[in-house]
């Protein structure tokens, strides 16, 4: 194939070269040379812009020339050129010097580079003839065009390939699927190099392609997606009108058959067997059925219906959208004792139908489902789902207010026993007879305390105590008139001396805890013993309130400052209840505006010249002076006193223990009381004497005195910790040398080691002479005779 293509390419090249030579010959023949005669007339005509006589026109050159020699394009010649070599030809413009060159003497133009028409179809150049000796232009500069002749060197290309398309299955023949398009970079205006025709290389006999437009169509009927849903079609585009020697390109078209609803649903089973407990809850799943459909997507969507066997509408069936399964659920409670089995006829059909495929139907199918109800031991069931009881609050204890009844729904019909859920009756107001179900009161009821009771009565099977049923019972306690009305606010009432007759001085009100059906109404009146009270009267407002009014004017605080008015209130219940109360009325002195000034029998009055504002100012000044005095006393009390050591102040009454053995009578070193002020300084720098016996001096240790017990406790713990953690502490008694020990003491040293280190006889008889305080010590260190006598 490549050899044939090369052969045709060379033939076309030779043909175009011959055509080019003929064209140039015609151009040279049609433009005769005009030779310069050399006379003045010729020069004068030359200076008067004579018609230029360039022998040239547009040139043509073939693209893709691959020869070893430069490609001859054409020849430029001026009629002023006498062939003596006096004229120089110069070339400029597009590609001059790089793509094209010119012979300066002959004017021959050659192409020195391979030309590609698809990159550039023509070049515009400029030519000029110069006098070789003077370089003066012999002719004005002129333009000429070099056109690149096209050859068929580009195959068609599918720029948008590969393609993906879809077509519904079962489409009629000739259904358009997709249009493909190929482009050829060759010159469409010259020859047939760019004339493309389409053909199908792979995909017959299912598809066809239009040779001119590239439209792909179906070529077979009844293409079934369920049999094959994918096709790979290869399309060829060939130039030169599809003739032999043309170049070709291919592309791939992936065609997918989309689904249509052309398959009816079918149940793989014609009979299903299911079982379910009668205790299954409503909306619970009984089982699943599935009608298979070879279609997909919306064409496979199913809807299910129960068309027979469920006259009581106990079951329901819905479609699971995730897998198109029919889910059978319980719509009403099941009862083994009522019906033990069901046989349902279920239909499955497509949700979406296509009219043009109805002849392939029917698009529905049926199956039967047999459901067996299994018996379950059920708890007792009450005759009513709830009970509502009304009872008066004055009912006697043990009164039956309701009888409940429950029975075992199973075939065994076991006997039941009744009880009350005590969590619903924490006050234990009621109890129920275990056998009869009679609900009775167990303690007095009080509507004002609890007006509603919500209890739960339980029924339990005797043979199976785990089976317990319950029913709610709501008890409303009805009111009886057992509470007398009481005053809501009953306090002392103040009135002015200058009160007028029939003046309102107090509004009284009362409440009643009872709740009569006809509404609450409280009546007010004066007590019978005060019905003819000359000072005050009562007016019932008929709205559960009453006004206390003055009957006369002229009250005097000095004559009588306090009045007591007994009141009577009663309700409208049956029986009618009443209560009494006494209103205390205090007579006060008031100013002209009615503001109370004093309610005492002998009120304190200010001088006429002293106003209330002046009194407030005086009291404020007194208060400020008191604050200043207290502040000064407080500052003087907390003022820091100078640090002085007084003989009386140094008496702390503390017992000071020394850790040094006494110097006896010779211990005349003065005791520094300052150590008591800071006992820690005396202890700082203390070293262990048993670890360094050669120490020259021993610091005197003063015990720390603490005011609080917790400080003493902390100090003791610190010393104990120091002793416990000291790994160098000797577990033995060692001889210590103290510089404070006196030589002239009568008692000398009490060191046990020093005593044992001497050979002298040790006698402690002198301890008895020291008095009663050393009696115990004398007994411990007595003579041998004494020890023997003990």
UniProtKB/Swiss-Prot annotation:
Membrane topology of this protein: Single-pass type I membrane protein
Signal peptide (residue range): 1-25
GO CC annotation: adherens junction; catenin complex
Residue ranges listed under propeptide: 26-52
Subcellular locations according to the entry: Cell membrane
Keywords: Calcium, Cell adhesion, Cell membrane, Cleavage on pair of basic residues, Glycoprotein, Membrane, Metal-binding, Repeat, Signal, Transmembrane, Transmembrane helix
Residue stretches in coiled coil: none
InterPro entries in the record: Cadherin, Cadherin-like_dom, Cadherin-like_sf, Cadherin_CS, Cadherin_Y-type_LIR, Catenin-bd_sf
Keyword Secreted carried by entry: no
Extracellular side: 26-612
Function summary: Cadherins are calcium-dependent cell adhesion proteins. They preferentially interact with themselves in a homophilic manner in connecting cells; cadherins may thus contribute to the sorting of heterogeneous cell types.
Entry text on domains: Three calcium ions are usually bound at the interface of each cadherin domain and rigidify the connections, imparting a strong curvature to the full-length ectodomain.
Protein name, as recorded: Cadherin-20
UniProt organism field: Xenopus laevis
Gene transcribed to yield this protein: cdh20
